Amino acid sequence: VGKKANARLPYLCVDMGYSVRPDFTTVVHDQGFAPVMRYPVSRQTVWASEKPEFGSQSPGPVQINGAFYCPAALPLARQRRLVRRLNELLDEQDGFEAHDQALRKLLPLLMGTNSRPLKFVSKRKRSPETIPTYQIDLVCPAVQGRVKCPLKPESLIIAFDQPEVKPTWSAERYRCCSKSQIRHTYTSEQWKLAQWGMVPGSWEHAIYYEAARSLTEQRFSIMKSQHLSGREHLKWSPRREPMISVIIALWIAATNLAIQDSHVAKKPRPSSIKKQKRRLERDLGRPLMSTPPRT
């Protein structure tokens, strides 16, 4: 059954070894997934939009950890590294509290999205060597009522009780400030970091990532168990690719059957993601800061 055009894309959770590979984001996008990943500590994760040509406007949105924000969020991005392991926050004094407070300041400035990343190839320059560009429709957060901004006068009325943005520039400086919605073209560096599903740094992203990675390691341990999958190594088969491929396929099938049998035999258990969220909320004494709607 084909999925609807506007259905949520399935998540693909990978470790940092894949996220740094050339064209990784392009492959994930073209296969119809939304990446969920972290970045090496040494990697630059804050990128401004492309510098405008003389006399033209800059797009404005700044990319922070793979997601786009209002230009006013740039000073906040420099205060704290957000994409981190939960154990790191646990080891810090009031680490969960500090992280939640940082999200309460930053997430309202998240740009709205009226589309997924769209692949664009110029008709005039189309050739086998043509490198496609990727674009996305972004909406000012003040237009969506998540913040109030003097550059969007209507937001002062509609979002009177929301956090206030105090820009030090005029609306003509950025396209995202002079217009309500823009179509932004990713720069090459922005595209390498892009994540269009969960917002990196958010509680949802951190909890899901660690749960998915934990489940992956659990499945690998089952595959490595000779008692469950019946396979220990590939040394006894002809060292030819077709035969090895068949053995690996049977290995995975046997593992899947073992997982299914184990699942049927056990009683239903509560979601580990929900349990972790409740645990964090008990630690904070209040609900976690959640990612605001972007559409």
Residues covered by each model-derived region:
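Short, basic/hydrophobic alpha-helical segments
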Residues: V1-Y11, F24-T25
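Short, conserved catalytic/metal-binding motifs centered on acidic residues
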Residues: L9-V20, P35, T216-F220, A253
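A short alpha/beta connector and helix-capping loop motif
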Residues: D23-P40
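Catalytic or ion-translocation cores adjacent to nucleophile or general acid/base/metal-coordination motifs
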Residues: P35-P52
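Long, low-complexity, polar/charged, intrinsically disordered or flexibly structured peripheral segments
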Residues: R116-V199
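Basic, amphipathic alpha-helical segments enriched in Lys/Arg and hydrophobic/aromatic residues
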Residues: Y208-T291
